[in-house]
Design a protein with these regions (language model features):
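The alpha-helix within a helix-turn-helix
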Residues: 55
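Pre-recognition alpha-helix immediately N-terminal to the DNA-recognition helix
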Residues: 18, 22, 38-41, 100
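Charged, amphipathic alpha-helical coiled-coil/dimerization segments
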Residues: 20, 70-130
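Short capping segments at the starts of secondary-structure elements
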Residues: 46-50
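N-terminal leader segment of winged-helix/HTH proteins
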Residues: 1-30
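Residues within helix-turn-helix
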Residues: 51-52, 63, 70, 90
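Key DNA-contact positions within bacterial/archaeal DNA-binding proteins
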Residues: 35-37, 63
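Short, locally clustered residues in the helix-turn-helix/winged-helix DNA-binding domain
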Residues: 13-16, 41-45, 106
């Protein structure tokens, strides 16, 4: 019998699926997904980002991001606007509705963070985060 729990890729996949399920269950009442939350989080930190910069931040190709932005735009959470300084560039801007969601959605992320970190010393969390970043960077 395969010892899948010894394979880092399997464990990462299981964790990712469980985290996605956690988020999507809690985000469903707001009409958004886990990926949409990442987009909104980036915009809450820096509104008016160029589409290509947002795609880079999120490690998404432009066609995947476009689909997510289409849905967020239909939900009136963001709008895409031409950049007045560069006619070839498009900026993604939060609407008032998108900005207002922040206070409702941030506790969901805080709940998951508390669950994941419960009983784990901060230095282990930092080491784990560094290891994940290292793995991700090696696969770029």
């Amino acid at each position: 019998m395969a010892q899948l729990d010894q394979h880092i890729c399997f464990l990462l996949d299981v964790a990712t699926r469980r985290i996605t399920k956690f988020y999507n269950r809690r985000l469903r009442p707001f009409g958004i997904t886990y990926n949409h939350l990442f987009i909104l989080t980036c915009l809450w930190e820096q509104d008016g980002v160029h589409v290509k910069d947002l795609a880079h931040q999120l490690c998404l190709d432009s066609s995947s991001l476009t689909g997510h932005l289409d849905r967020l735009e239909r939900s009136a959470l963001v709008v895409r606007q031409d950049d007045p300084d560069d006619r070839r560039a498009i900026r993604v801007v939060l609407t008032a509705k998108g900005r207002d969601l922040k206070d409702q959605l941030e506790p969901i992320g805080q709940e998951l963070k508390a669950t994941l970190q419960r009983g784990v010393p901060p230095e282990r969390i930092q080491a784990f985060t560094a290891a994940l970043r290292n793995i991700s960077n090696r696969l770029e």
